[in-house]
Amino acid sequence: MTAPSCAFPVQFRQPSVSGLSQITKSLYISNGVAANNKLMLSSNQITMVINVSVEVVNTLYEDIQYLQVPVADAPDSRLCDFFDPVADHIHSVEMKQGRTLLHCAAGVSRSAALCLAYLMKYHAMSLLDAHTWTKSCRPIIRPNSGFWEQLIHYEFQLFGKNTVHMVSSPMGMIPDIYEKEVRLMIPL
């Protein structure tokens, strides 16, 4: 991986799928239920909650800042409009020694896609490396195909090359990193 290891947590606990998943020392991903759990937020010292949904309403707690990113989990939603502003915001919180929780409804597609954009921009990770790392921390991530197309375009903007490509499959266009998985699911 191309990211400096000092920015990433030591993997001393199992990856989480229901609670908060720690991605870096200052960035976590979760679903909407976990994002409204005061004990979970305080025990992980969360200072900023970024809600990437239109359907989840946050309970507002003192000493925590909130940012709403109103995007539906649909392939035609323009999540890319938020790649830079959200990555910049996460970085700004980190520079102030804060911790950010990025969440959507399930913690699978929208929040994961914005996490990948942040890792590419601020940790100089390729899209493939960012996905591999994030999936190791939160195994259920799976941005929708439209978000993948936007991430692939963003990776090219940042680095002038791509490490993930969209390919045709019986399920439609998918990122090539899912190709083997789809082949196992659909017998030819």
From Swiss-Prot:
Gene3D superfamilies: Protein tyrosine phosphatase superfamily
Protein name: Dual specificity protein phosphatase 18
Region (Sufficient for mitochondrial localization): 95-141
Limits of the Tyrosine-protein phosphatase domain: 19-160
Record family assignment: Belongs to the protein-tyrosine phosphatase family. Non-receptor class dual specificity subfamily.
Enzyme class: hydrolase
Gene Ontology molecular function terms on file: MAP kinase tyrosine/serine/threonine phosphatase activity; phosphatase activity; protein serine/threonine phosphatase activity; protein tyrosine phosphatase activity; protein tyrosine/serine/threonine phosphatase activity
Stated role: Can dephosphorylate single and diphosphorylated synthetic MAPK peptides, with preference for the phosphotyrosine and diphosphorylated forms over phosphothreonine. In vitro, dephosphorylates p-nitrophenyl phosphate (pNPP).
Record-level GO cellular component terms: cytoplasm; mitochondrial inner membrane; nucleus
EC number: 3.1.3.16, 3.1.3.48
Swiss-Prot/TrEMBL keywords: Cytoplasm, Hydrolase, Membrane, Mitochondrion, Mitochondrion inner membrane, Nucleus, Protein phosphatase
InterPro entries noted in UniProt: Atypical_DUSP_subfamB, Dual-sp_phosphatase_cat-dom, Prot-tyrosine_phosphatase-like, Tyr_Pase_AS, Tyr_Pase_dom, TYR_PHOSPHATASE_DUAL_dom
Protein species of origin: Pongo abelii (Sumatran orangutan)
Record-linked Pfam families: DSPc (PF00782)
Compartments where located: Cytoplasm; Nucleus; Mitochondrion inner membrane
Superkingdom: Eukaryota
